[in-house]
Amino acid sequence: MSATPQVSDASFKEDVLDSELPVLVDFWAPWCGPCRMVAPVVDEISQQYEGKVKVVKLNTDENPNTASQYGIRSIPTLMIFKGGQRVDMVVGAVPKTTLASTLEKYL
């Protein structure tokens, strides 16, 4: 299992929207093959940007309200939030370099 903390519908506002740091949210599900492929990349990003970016995962099967609120149609979807607003997103299993360069714009 991933070392990246999980958030839920109930904790999303506090953990993501109210965060002082930019937040990368990995919308995923256990049955999703590409989600499993991108999980190690998300964990590496979490370690690489520790203290600069908060990285969390949201299981879309267990937390459909938040996924629906942000129009998640396919997973994995990686969304970046800053100041309580969605500022960017990357859909699909992407290389670490793609994810890192997207994140860098918001640091």
Curated annotation (Swiss-Prot):
InterPro entries attached to this UniProt entry: Thioredoxin (IPR005746), Thioredoxin-like_sf (IPR036249), Thioredoxin_CS (IPR017937), Thioredoxin_domain (IPR013766)
Keywords carried by this UniProt record: Disulfide bond, Electron transport, Redox-active center, Transport
GO cellular component terms, semicolon-separated: cytoplasm
GO molecular function, one term: protein-disulfide reductase activity
Pfam families: Thioredoxin
Highest taxon of the lineage: Bacteria
Disulfide bonds: 32-35
Segments forming domain Thioredoxin: 2-107
Family, per entry: Belongs to the thioredoxin family.
NCBIfam families to which the protein is assigned, alphabetical: thioredoxin
Function: Component of the thioredoxin-thioredoxin reductase system. Participates in various redox reactions through the reversible oxidation of its active center dithiol to a disulfide and catalyzes dithiol-disulfide exchange reactions.
Protein name: Thioredoxin
Source species of the chain: Synechocystis sp. (strain ATCC 27184 / PCC 6803 / Kazusa)
Lineage, broadest ranks: Bacteria, Bacillati, Cyanobacteriota, Cyanophyceae, Synechococcales
Gene name linked to the record: trxA
